[in-house]
């Protein structure tokens, strides 16, 4: 498994909406992620700044790179766009983090 971590940003007045939408994650979104080899996906919020820290395990990069091309992912991005910083294609502005420590 490949460990991945990213940072995104949610608007400060949208924290509750962001959490509520993820609490009710569409079943088809969860199914698609699992079908593309995503496991143990967690998102944490730093309330002082609105930074979101996402951590997930993926089976392989090629399969994971296909997630963004799915129709359900595109719909999810549009649904979440009013709550967070996004790119022109409505994907979240996301910065991959470099792993500097790991204890197995």
Curated annotation (Swiss-Prot):
Active-site residues (renumbered): 22
Pathway it works in: Carbohydrate metabolism; L-rhamnose metabolism
Gene3D superfamilies: 3.30.70.100
Cellular location(s): Cytoplasm
EC supergroup of this enzyme: isomerase
GO terms of molecular function: L-rhamnose mutarotase activity
GO biological process: rhamnose catabolic process
Residues that, per the record, bind substrate: 18, 41, 76-77
Catalytic reaction equation(s): alpha-L-rhamnose = beta-L-rhamnose
Gene Ontology CC entries for this record: cytoplasm
InterPro entries: Dimeric_a/b-barrel, L-rhamnose_mutarotase, Rham/fucose_mutarotase
EC code(s) of this entry: 5.1.3.32
Keywords in alphabetical order: Carbohydrate metabolism, Cytoplasm, Isomerase, Rhamnose metabolism
PANTHER family linked to this entry: L-RHAMNOSE MUTAROTASE
Assembly mode: Homodimer.
Protein family according to the UniProt entry: Belongs to the rhamnose mutarotase family.
Described function: Involved in the anomeric conversion of L-rhamnose.
Protein name (record): L-rhamnose mutarotase
Protein species of origin: Shouchella clausii (strain KSM-K16) (Alkalihalobacillus clausii)
Gene behind the chain: rhaM
